[in-house]
Amino acid sequence: MTAYAIASLRNTTVPNEEVFDYMERIQSTLDPFGGRFLVHGARLEEIEGTWPGGVVVITFPDLAAAHGWYDSEPYQELLPLRTRNLDGEVVFVEGVAPGYDPSTTAARIRAEVGRGVHGGASA
């Protein structure tokens, strides 16, 4: 199942040489794991609420590839260039299968709630 790394980054308005170095080198850490950028520094339109910063979305073939990339020695060596200069959060999330229908998930969760076995809102 396709997986995504999603980052919400703040304090990104004053890039420095470490940030440039990070940006120039990150793709080479993604390539061995099939990672590629879908969103990076694009214009952001707030529709509901206030978004705290920029958005980055990277796609991977699956969660194992995403974790493999993040835990890899080349990325771990590069990571401090970002964490020293940008604040934010990063999550991994699985995508949905082609043809996904949210009404099926609603029915499953409704049944779980009815049986008292569903404790959260995750799909």
Residue ranges of each PLM-predicted region?
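A contiguous, mid-protein "functional segment" used to position or interact
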Residues: 64-99
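Short S/T/G/P-rich N-terminal loop/turn motif that feeds into the first structured element of a domain
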Residues: 1-54, 61-68, 94-123
